[in-house]
């Protein structure tokens, strides 16, 4: 408000400049112009006016603390930016350590002995190789990572190349036997005589029996007919008629004929025959080759072995032929 008034006396101006400077900063320039216009005609107080001008300017500069703070803040930011730029550049740079061949040899030899060296070992290696402990630690860390990667690749190659053909070779027969996991192809494949002859059966080999001829072992009509014929020989041998027994022995080759089976009557069996303890042994004895061997024994030794066929009698026939 004082800026809009007219010129004041010099004494009042000196006292009012301080108040006006503290109250409104926009009045300083107008007051300076007014003082210059008043003192222009050559009055003797020009030096005092110049002093007051200097005081007004200094007060106006220091009277605005907000502007000063802004200026200081801008200067501080500029200084911070200038100080941060070189530090950022240093952080972005990665210092790579170039190892010599001697250092690498020493590090590799230590790595072969111990892949996880402790603090003291790393310090010793650092002394030997003229490196820092941190560099040695980082080198061992990177070397272990490379070693693990190589081990994984080697295991993958072994599983892919080494064991693959072996597993494929083992699985080929099962692919042939079970194509598409369909179990209805067993009848189409069948078991031929050639496939059975090429296979080995240790049980039949121990008994000297061909597996193809094992069908005759489980044929009950032949065994029953042989036992019936052997039972017909017993009475003739007991009564002392050698001719009939020899004739019956000569006719053993025709045991499987239906005429003989129908001609020889078998009495009714009230109870089932007992199962022999050695099924395979009795059936082998009832085969055609064993009967021929018995015929030869009868012809050579007479009546000494005539009673042997009685062991092949069933329980029913033995009970009927036994004298009461």
Curated annotation (Swiss-Prot):
One of its GO terms (cellular component) is nucleus. It is found in: Nucleus; Cytoplasm. Keywords: Cytoplasm, Developmental protein, DNA-binding, Homeobox, Nucleus, Phosphoprotein. The modification Phosphothreonine is found at residue 97. Residues 67-80 have a biased composition (Basic and acidic residues). Interacts with EFEMP2. Interacts (when unphosphorylated on Thr-97) with ELAVL1/HUR. This is Pituitary homeobox 2.
